Amino acid sequence: MKRIKLLLILLIGGVTLTSCVVRNEIVDDGFSLNEYISSYDLWYVDYHRTTGSGEVPFLSRAFTISFLNGTMYANNNIVDIGKTGNGLGIAVGNYSTYGTILETRHDIDGYFEFDVVQLSNNEIRIDDLSQNVSYYLVGYQTDTFDYNMLFYENIEYFLQEFKAWERTDETGGAPNPFDNEHYLKFTHKNDVTFYSSHDPFGTNVDYINWDFEGSYIVRNVIGENNLKYLTLNYDNGDTEEFDLTVINDETIRLKHVSSRTTYIFSGIEFIQYLKAEKTNTTKPAVRSSGRKRTKIKRETVPKRK
């Protein structure tokens, strides 16, 4: 009889102790996760590392995500990043945590639940529990975020964020056919199509006649983080090669390889992707919700001599 009582006491005590341990771990983990994800101002969505066949729409649009006091923010544009919403972007929903679970409620895309795996001090993987997809996020503070990295790692998207690029300066070099190109356009319909125009400078962007069409390629350069090689392949068979650098968030420099001419292009009509109605941008803008990021694999080549 004593043995039975003792066994029951041990069993009950073990269950009670186990329950307490599990409950404490969940509470501690939940608090830690909430504290951890809000300890970084920005989480850069390293979309090129995404794995799986599923998709979370708001993460496919965002360059950065932020979690602050239950509100979720996103930067869906490269242009004006660091300015909109004091660097956090726009409010896009809310979130909560428990254990290792992150629950998000996006204003447009609805409810998603993620399991969060910490990979390093400032890097996490979030796994969608309802579909086969994982996203990789890297944490930064706004005052230490590498905006140059953002521009150059996502240069194709930056080129798409204006309805057109107007040539505003030309210096040096030998005369060449590209001197006649006054406007360029890179569409968000895919990541390879461009258009060009000989229309006079100052033409309203909605009335530009796009004379030529083709495909473009961006290549990484070994040892150069702030330089890309841009190739324009015209459908008529012509090819133009450039050294591409970003001057600021609305200006690019194209150095023509064969003629050594340097062209400056400025963006016209900034396209806001899923922005709030009231934003801090001073750029003339149109709004669009049609763009999602895709995984871009670039060739890396030696620097030209």
Show which residues each predicted segment covers.
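Positively charged n-region of N-terminal signal peptides that target proteins for export
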Residues: 1-6
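Hydrophobic membrane-insertion alpha-helices, especially the h-region
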Residues: 12-13
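Lipid interaction determinants
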Residues: 21-92, 101-305
